[in-house]
UniProtKB/Swiss-Prot annotation:
Belongs to the class-II aminoacyl-tRNA synthetase family. It catalyses: tRNA(Gly) + glycine + ATP = glycyl-tRNA(Gly) + AMP + diphosphate. Its main location: cytoplasm. SUPFAM superfamilies: HD-domain/PDEase-like. NCBIfam families: glyS (TIGR00211). InterPro entries: DALR_anticod-bd, Gly-tRNA-synth_bsu, Gly-tRNA-synth_heterodimer. GO terms for cellular component: cytosol. This is Glycine--tRNA ligase beta subunit. Keywords: Aminoacyl-tRNA synthetase, ATP-binding, Cytoplasm, Ligase, Nucleotide-binding, Protein biosynthesis. The gene is glyS. Its EC number is 6.1.1.14. GO terms for biological process: arginyl-tRNA aminoacylation; glycyl-tRNA aminoacylation. It is found in: Cytoplasm. It comes from Pediococcus pentosaceus (strain ATCC 25745 / CCUG 21536 / LMG 10740 / 183-1w).
Amino acid sequence: MAHNYLLEIGLEEIPAHVVTPSIKQLVQKVTAFLKENRLTYDSIDHFSTPRRLAIRINGLGDQQPDIEEDAKGPARKIAQDADGNWTKAAIGFTRGQGLTVDDITFKTIKGTDYVYVHKLIKGKMTKEILTGLKEVVESINFPTMMKWANFDFKYVRPIRWLVSILDEEVLPFSILDVTAGRRTEGHRFLGEAVELANAEEYEAKLHDQFVIVDADERKQLISNQIKAIAESNRWNVTPNPGLLEEVNNLVEWPTAFNGGFDEKYLAIPEEVLITSMRDHQRFFFVRDQAGKLLPNFISVRNGNEEFIENVVRGNEKVLTARLEDAAFFYEEDQKHDINYYVDRLKKVSFHDKIGSMYEKLQRVNSIAKVIGNTLNLNQTELDDIDRATMIYKFDLVTGMVGEFSELQGVMGEKYAQLNGENQAVAQAIREHYMPNSAEGDLPESVTGAVVALADKFDNIFSFFSAGMIPSGSNDPYALRRHAYGIVRILNSRDWQLDLNQFKSQVKTELAENGTAFGVDVDQNFDQVLNFFNDRIKQLLDHQKISHDIVETVLTGNNHDVTEIIEAAQVLADAKASSTFKDDIEALTRVQRIATKNEESGELNVDPQLFNNASEGELFDQIIKIEAANNLTMSQLFAKLCELTPAISKYFDATMVMDKDENIKRNRLNMMSRLANLILKIGDLTNVLVK
């Protein structure tokens, strides 16, 4: 007979951002529990609101299936004495298995006889096992935990009730002072407690108490209500998915409504209005048919339509107060020019071990010059970058950003435009924060991309120089995100930047300009390179590049981020080639013999010491590749693969490790020069070939 089991954890209000990951975790843990305990079932339904996490397991069997197994015991020489009598070890083993020595058989494993018993394990009843879900409930992890009353137990919020019903039967267990039963709670204000007769009536009974437990159903209802309000007012609304998810996890009985604010506040930059509505008040902003922002909003209350007009007025009042503050700051900020705010950055600490925000601007300006010159940007672009990096953090000390920190960069762009800065400079001030998440949008402008790179490089150089290097999950200054942003920006624009050369150029520029302010870019630079390799690996993993190729390109001698990524794609594409195996084997043969070279200086090769034609033929081709300028990784790999016949011919005719020391050194130097070209692609000995 199939059974249905309901488990509900009743809590005080959970933070909205915790609800969805928590119910997912509960489902995962319950699924693992059922598998571990060999319980068969048809499906698992999940339910979540701000006050409850619940699952219903459908189609459970009566009990675990019986299983048979052979249990291994001690070796025969331990289980029996010299006369063949059973020892205490044998008797104790069989007793522990619920059997007797009469059930013993022997199996030989690697020449040794061992005691075995065959036993039947009867399956436990389902209801007996399900009470073990108590441990599952207690094991859920949350980003923030709390204690309550006098208990040492920690949970996301205090547990106020538990429901545990198998069909119509309560399966009781207790957590702290709460014992599971069939009583659940309705809406905090509109509903009341209700007892469930069985697991199947869960949704209906709570719906009667103004709780929609199905999160997907609740979200769809909210979307429909927003759409209806928008259509009736001829508004355009595109609900932000993140906000919709958050609002959904704030309510149990959603009722959407609309309100408005004075049109005078439309003089404030749109981003400020949207931030006030969306991020601070959880409102959905609206536009007219032409896309213009309107002085209206849509919000969702946790309740019904009763006294909805009071709710509207209350929300309008709160929003108006916030917009009044914004209008004040917007007006006050414009009383000073950009230089005033830049000067104030001298008193703002970037970090107490590194220096002020003003010093950071000077350092970033120097770093940006190196980037701009390396990329051969035109003078207009270089001038824009120079100006942008001298002011790009000024908005941090404005009143608006002090009140609305989410608008840093955005307000910098607005105020820069108002102060007559050109669009490239203004846009770069906003874009230097990009990407602001692992897969966030990248800067659209060249100036913005360079300023973003310089700012992020400075963060990494500064904190690594001060010894504040991320470890494990600890990354308080988001340096991993900054490094990954650098990798993505360089790769997206196909900008070549050798990290070794770049570091040396930055060191020189900082020294010449006197803008290092204690930051030593040489300090922990090996760890900086490893740090970037990890971020390149992250990007290549995201692109589904195989592990062996990732390892190959990261263990070469190339420190150009874009070229490393290109090399990985070149190798991934080349794997399908019919000649790939032969090419890799030829090139790795060169690499392996080159490791025997003890020369560390200039790798001179004297053609006068060649003893056969194959040496000269191969060397001529090596010189041509070395002389080729600006080869892409695709072109370089193609030229290396073209050497396969010459390499094979060379090794057929040449003994590299010649008895004559001069000839041997000459040949090893030639192999090392070719190996160095190969290592620009990567260490091909890591490539798996079939």
